[in-house]
């Protein structure tokens, strides 16, 4: 079950974007009591979420970012060049050293037996730059 998903510099998204399925600690929980579950390891997780926005607001690119991340796991193929998905607003043609061509992803999931995994990956035009997987048994929001 996905708890948090963050990505940066993907297609139309320049800044870091975060999508969370964790129930907020606010009045919203009282208004929608049937829309979250509590798990033994400490997290309160929303049952449903909706992504809304205006036309050309990035909803499709958000879903494409998940598809791109899924490619690393499902296809298990060598990373190709993905120049067309890096946010081109971060490329300074006059000074390549200042280019921000790095895509970053972070996803937190709740797996079986109450174990929380966090996977982070950074890629650029050439391939994977950095990758990390860690886990914990208790979740603190």
Task: Show the residue positions of the predicted features.
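P-loop NTPase switch/coupling surface
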Residues: 1-141
């Amino acid at each position: 079950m996905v708890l948090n998903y963050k990505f940066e510099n993907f297609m139309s998204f320049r800044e870091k974007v975060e999508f969370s399925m964790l129930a907020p600690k606010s009045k919203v929980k009282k208004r929608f009591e049937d829309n979250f579950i509590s798990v033994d390891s400490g997290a309160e997780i929303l049952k449903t979420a909706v992504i809304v926005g205006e036309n050309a607001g990035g909803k499709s690119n958000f879903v494409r970012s998940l598809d791109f991340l899924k490619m690393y796991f499902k296809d298990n193929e060598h990373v190709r060049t993905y120049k067309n998905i890096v946010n081109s607003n971060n490329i300074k043609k006059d000074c390549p050293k200042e280019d921000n061509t790095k895509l970053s992803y972070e996803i937190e999931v709740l797996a079986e037996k109450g174990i929380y995994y966090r996977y982070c990956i950074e890629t650029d035009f050439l391939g994977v730059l950095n990758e990390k997987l860690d886990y914990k048994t208790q979740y603190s929001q």
